[in-house]
Amino acid sequence: MRSFRIFLAVVSALAGTTAFAQAQAPVQFPEYQFTVVKENPVTSVKNQHRSGTCWVFSALGFVESEVIRINGITDPAQYPDFSEMFVVSKSYYERGIKYVRLDGCLGFSAGSEADDVLDVIRDYGIVPQSVMSGMNYGTELPVQGEMDAVLKGFIEAATKNPNRKLTTAWKNAYKGILDAYLGPCPEKFTVDGKEYTPASYRDALQFNPDDYVSLTSFTHHPFYTKFAIEVCDNWRGDEAWNVPIDELVEALDNAVMNGYTVAWGSDVSEPGFTRNGMAVLVNTEAKQTAGSDQERWVGPAFDKPAAKPGKKDAKKEAKPEVKQPVEFVVTQESRQEEFDNKQTTDDHGMQIYGIANDQFGRKYYMVKNSWGESGKYKGIWYATEAFVRGKSIDIVLHKDALPQALKDKLGIK
């Protein structure tokens, strides 16, 4: 996933214009009361901080929940905590090799996809956070701008091939940068008195990356076939099954209600995705009356009607009740249009682990983020079904979490 900071930088640059400021006015939400319908186990909320690594934090959180489910772990004290930076190191190394091989015709950045995590676990294994924290550069939380820039500078220099023949040293030098910032990837380590390699530890956890599938939903490829989603961070070209959006949501619901969590890739640049734990696909057209004569008399679309000017007693004036924002109605066609015109982009990776309803009866997905215990819900977001329908790039889930009818259509055993 590309860093959400890019979007924030654009917001900062444009916020000085009146039109933009009006269009992006903060969305008002009522005081929600959520009732949990289904909630599956997740590990603690982590903090990717100043790094573009949401993809690994979200996907490893998903893997941790899968290990909990597969092994029947009920004691939170025994929940696994895997090393994000082990995966980052392996992924960055392979990406650099491919970048040079393709003469630089490949996206090279900190961003990637959930499937990349499964690929690394399949090829190398996995290690606990306790044996590789990845924090070798003097900060308590990830701050990786320098590392990203140094890696890119090195790999671009190697790609230019100034000697007209690549030396035998460049791969070791590149790996040396990764080791300097993240620490060497352990070849052996001990857990509970037993020695493991990354691969044997993966196997001991009974986690099989080949048991997982990716789903997406776009019309520029045939349904019930696989294709590599055309986003820069999908540098491996991993493929997802293309299904109608109704069936993707049905698969998501089936997974959650049957004890599975889901890795979720989504656009988060909508004004209804807030830093206070909400993800609502707000119909911004309902806010275009701001400052108009209509608003003067009847109030904004998402508030109670305003009283007539000059008739209010300031001492008795009550704050208007904030109602549910109106959401866009998502169709298969609207999803495709927004993907094609870059209104839906590959922004952020998260983990969906539950379903809840608010006091108005609206359905939400419970989402674990990787921005620390921030916001009103301490690192948890509540995403409406409309938001998930409209803004999802893909989901990753266990194949047994799929409805049987969809498994049959895809030929998945």
Where are these regions (language model features)?
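Residue-level marker of positions within ordered structural domains that often coincide
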Residues: A9, A59, Y92, I121, ...
